[in-house]
Amino acid sequence: MKYWLKKSSWLLAGSLLSTPLAMANEFSASFKGTDIQEFINIVGRNLEKTIIVDPSVRGKVDVRSFDTLNEEQYYSFFLSVLEVYGFAVVEMDNGVLKVIKSKDAKTSAIPVLSGEERANGDEVITQVVAVKNVSVRELSPLLRQLIDNAGAGNVVHYDPANIILITGRAAVVNRLAEIIRRVDQAGDKEIEVVELNNASAAEMVRIVEALNKTTDAQNTPEFLKPKFVADERTNSILISGDPKVRERLKRLIKQLDVEMAAKGNNRVVYLKYAKAEDLVEVLKGVSENLQAEKGTGQPTTSKRNEVMIAAHADTNSLVLTAPQDIMNAMLEVIGQLDIRRAQVLIEALIVEMAEGDGINLGVQWGSLESGSVIQYGNTGASIGNVMIGLEEAKDTTQTKAVYDTNNNFLRNETTTTKGDYTKLASALSSIQGAAVSIAMGDWTALINAVSNDSSSNILSSPSITVMDNGEASFIVGEEVPVITGSTAGSNNDNPFQTVDRKEVGIKLKVVPQINEGNSVQLNIEQEVSNVLGANGAVDVRFAKRQLNTSVMVQDGQMLVLGGLIDERALESESKVPLLGDIPLLGQLFRSTSSQVEKKNLMVFIKPTIIRDGVTADGITQRKYNYIRAEQLFRAEKGLRLLDDASVPVLPKFGDDRRHSPEIQAFIEQMEAKQ
């Protein structure tokens, strides 16, 4: 009875000492002679966890803590106490804890961690560790010596995947995983470089890999399998693996790396896209650099004789002669340069709108008898030329006496000669508007009045397709003759003129460059020009609008390149001094011209990247169908004066790619059903 009271008093004391001391869930962990099952119950109650205790768990707990513990520390303390007494805690999926013997824990449903996952404390876990460079078959026995195999610890390995499974307390498992990580790194440095003098590194790797394949290769761990990498830049082979295997492979490589019986290595490379002549200079520069880096110590002339690069234009191919290492480098360069280059469709819109109003009113005076004139340069016609033309246009009458053979007077005959209107027509041809001539005695007045109203709206849409980084030029216009000089003969009997021709119209020059992200950089030179005034070879004036720029545009995006807005108000007046200033009457001695002009010019551009034949075919079909639709519209309207005439029309797009009659009939039948 006394023994029972004594035992109960100790249990009560342990319970009081382990109760929370504050609302912050701090615990005092001191137990003396407490039954282990009671100890487990106290901890479960304090942590509010459900704990299932194996019936084989028996004993007493003696432990003292002088510091208060928080909830996490208290749980770690609980695990450590059970570990000391040979028990372990296994947490199930539903959060319930099981307390069992340590040796039984490794066969229970304990947590499984892999990769960088980690656990702490004395919790029993299983860690999966992947080993890359060391054989797990050799590593496992070493690890078993560092773990409690009689308790919860255990180490097993799986050869095909070269992995290790470690079961035990979390702290011990973490320590073994760290040991594996450090040991596994040592294998990464076991790499040897074998330089080749004659053979090609890539070809040597292919041969050695074929010879190294054995019947038991599938059962060999990945770590023990040798690995080969060809470094074509230095023409060497990198070998990793077991030292004995590496040594055997090095001997094999040296036996194969011998000089060829026939010196020289010739190769003909047929190009698919690049131009052979363009690649010759590039390859010569590459080969010279490779020979300089190789540094064989041979004379410069000997080195150059080793490499020969020529282009065969008829077959668009390259003929190469070089040592194997340089040959491989040049073939790699050719493979990277001989690619299908993208194309760019450049569509431009040039919009020019102009309107103008003007009026001209003037009076000119002239006298044939005295030769006096009052004329102005802004009227378009000179009264002097008009007066001369009028005088030459008059009929002339002549009277002539007629005599017989004996010189006897018979009669007078009168003949009238028609006037010459050539001079008058030339003078009047330059008149615009209305011109009225009034004769007052010897003086003649020429009144000229004209009013003009002009408006134009010009839309030009040139388009051109060009290769990436290629230059394309486009011109639509005409060549205008311009006199550049004149020379007379020695006796002024054979004068001649030198004439140059100037291109006038719409010019477009583009160099596109496709950049990352389907953006296109465009270097553009654009010009719009036309002839001003009479279309002759003397005093020809040209109007030119030119734009030079470099822009970045997204694929399929339209961008405005520039514009010009020009407004002019012009007024000119020519008059006779003093007389032209007289009110009202002064209008008879002056010529006035007023003009208002307004021009708008805008240039837009849109690039479209064409990377394949499908895109090119779609763009071509769109343009083709547009022209064909215009022709069909005109054909439907017909010709006004030729009812029976037929208007030519393009065939349907794709008719040139028709199939055999049987297949084509089937396709047309299916299209008709749709």
UniProtKB/Swiss-Prot annotation:
Region annotation (N3) ranges: 264-338
Signal peptide: 1-24
Recorded superkingdom: Bacteria
Record note on what altering L522D does: No complex assembly
Entry GO terms, CC: cell outer membrane; type II protein secretion system complex
Region ranges (S domain): 614-674
Biological process terms in GO annotation: protein secretion; protein secretion by the type II secretion system
Region span, N0: 25-121
Pfam families cross-referenced by the UniProt entry: Secretin, Secretin_N, type_II_gspD_N0
Region listing for Secretin, in residue ranges: 343-612
Keywords: Cell outer membrane, Membrane, Protein transport, Signal, Transmembrane, Transmembrane beta strand, Transport
MF term (GO), any: identical protein binding
Effect of G505A: No complex assembly
Chain positions of site May serve as a pivot that allows opening of the central gate for substrate egress: G477
Annotated TM spans: none
Family: Belongs to the bacterial secretin family. GSP D subfamily.
Role of this protein: Involved in a type II secretion system (T2SS, formerly general secretion pathway, GSP) for the export of proteins. Required for secretion of cholera toxin through the outer membrane. This subunit forms the outer membrane channel.
Domains (record comment): The N0, N1, N2 and N3 domains are periplasmic, while the secretin and S domains form a channel that is partially inserted in the outer membrane. The cap gate extends out on the extracellular side of the channel partially closing the channel. The secretin domain forms a double beta-barrel structure; the outer barrel has an outer diameter of about 110 Angstroms while the inner barrel forms the central gate with a small pore in the closed state.
Record's protein name: Secretin GspD
